[in-house]
Amino acid sequence: MIQRTTDPAAGSSTSGPPTNSLSWGSRHNGKLYTLEVVQHPIRARMCGFGDKDRRPLAPAAVATMNVYREDNTQVEVDDIDCSFFLVTVDLWSEDGKQEMNLVLHPNAAQDRGPPMPAKPRRPTNPPPPSNTHGSPPAPAIPFPSYGPPTPYYPPWSAPASDRSPSSASAVLPSISTSFGRAPGPSSATPYGPQYGPPSASSYGPPSASAYGPPSASAYGPPSASAYGPPSASTYGPSSASAYGPPSSASYGPPTSSYASSYPPYHYGPPPPPFGNYGSTSNFDHSQPVTSSVDQETNSPVVTTTARDDDQREGEASTSAAGNPRADPSNSGAPSTSPTASTMGRRESRGRRRRREEREGPDGGPDLREPIEPGSTKAREEEDARTGTEKGDPKDKSDAQRATYTRTLVGPLSSNATRLLDEHRKPGIFFLFQDLSVRTEGTFRLRLRLMNVGAPPAPEPGAAGVHTGVSPVLAQVFTKPFTVFSAKRFPGVPDTTALSIAFNQQNMKLPLRNRHGSGSKRRRRGAGGGSDDEESD
């Protein structure tokens, strides 16, 4: 129990506890514990707000513990177990009534002002520039093919002259299907940049000019030699037979020997629908596409895989923006918005990213490390979603804690040590040789004595440190001392005899260098100079 004590009875042969009202002691198990300052700091130079420049108090603060019995006789030092005694220190005002342990950090003034508005985040992938002049896109010039032509041909059951636009659109390849490029306006391609409905003449039999030398228009059906068994002439150099006009048998159904020798051929991917003429196709050519012929209607049936569902949904949702024919009021007018395939691809990427966040990168369950709410990573992700900069003060309490710093720098506690003073008298001392003050002013140190040993502490016999609350056994204040700025600092005071005595007992206390360094003294002796004392 912590309590204030009065002076011991008059006539005691031993020195009693200090009589200052700010200093007091307490009794525990019939013994009075007091604390006395035997060396007071006089002055110091302010160390500022850095952590490397340390300016210790001079001289160092030193306190001693005294224990009195009930008859006011002092207990000998050898009879005291000082293993678990320690003294804590903090900074107070000159009158000892106001605590001065915290000071406002000068660099924290900007944190106390209004928060700066968050800067808008720049988009990672800016949208492609729209066509503001309404001009059609530049034609894509496909590179010539010098190999054998790809065998795209009409279905077997329908003659070439009876092909309807629907069947022809599902069979005839487009430029983007054969070469992986966007279709451009060309005189020979049936899917030019026109915006009106395609005429039936676009699907008639190809002219003879389509089978000339390889060019941008050489995408019609191959010659009859392409349907027979492979031969050297098929894969050899380009010849007139490979690119000449096809015979009438090219468009007829295959013979029974050919049909029995070779399996039916799977058609290539269909061209884009009529609503997307003039826009870039976004079909995924890496997926297998199969085709068959309906026996009742003699029309091809195309089957694709389901991996492009996200992409097709994106194209369907943006068809009005990418197709100028979707709005009757815009009939014949060029489109000024991004194409449907670009917007669909952008939407499919966002959908795929959200799916990876939900299911994991490989489509399975998300096995990544969970993010705890309130953690640093969770706050960073929240800042990324809301567009908040890193420097914005998210937590006001953190900003307020960073505003203040400790005024008293250094170790704020000291263990008990048995030493001899300057008169060779033993005692239990507490040394504070590395204390610094950040700001200038007049202060006092408050010292408090406590014992952290387990019962029967503070009596001898404690086996360890207890985990509860330790009562304060005694309290004492030092005399006021002054902290100066670097320009006003008058200098370090003279070294005391007590500091020299402790230094001789291997206690590292800061001492004033009265004779300078050894090298300077040797140079002065060699040059015949005087050996006057110097102060630092």
Curated annotation (Swiss-Prot):
Composition bias, Basic and acidic residues: 306-315, 356-399
GO process terms (BP): sporulation resulting in formation of a cellular spore
Subcellular compartments: Nucleus; Cytoplasm
Domain of life: Eukaryota
Keywords, alphabetical: Cytoplasm, Nucleus, Sporulation, Transcription, Transcription regulation
Comp. bias regions, Polar residues: 1-26, 280-305, 400-409
Keyword Isomerase part of the UniProt annotation: no
Start and end residues of each Velvet domain: 25-512
Gene Ontology cellular-component annotations: cytoplasm; nucleus
Bias type Basic residues, positions: 511-525
Compositional bias ranges of the Pro residues kind: 114-143
Record field: compositional bias (Low complexity): 158-170, 190-265, 328-342
Pfam families (alphabetical): Velvet
InterPro entries, per the entry: Velvet, Velvet_dom, Velvet_dom_sf
Coiled-coil parts of chain: none
Induction profile: Expression is down-regulated during fruiting body formation.
Ribosomal protein as UniProt keyword: no
Region annotated Disordered, chain positions: 1-27, 106-143, 157-409, 508-536
Family designation: Belongs to the velvet family. VelB subfamily.
Subunit organization: Component of the heterotrimeric velvet complex composed of laeA, veA and velB; VeA acting as a bridging protein between laeA and velB. Forms a heterodimeric complex with vosA; the formation of the velB-vosA complex is light-dependent.
Functional summary from the UniProt entry: Component of the velvet transcription factor complex that controls sexual/asexual developmental ratio in response to light, promoting sexual development in the darkness while stimulating asexual sporulation under illumination. The velvet complex acts as a global regulator for secondary metabolite gene expression. Component of the velB-VosA heterodimeric complex that plays a dual role in activating genes associated with spore maturation and repressing certain development-associated genes.
Protein name according to UniProt: Velvet complex subunit B
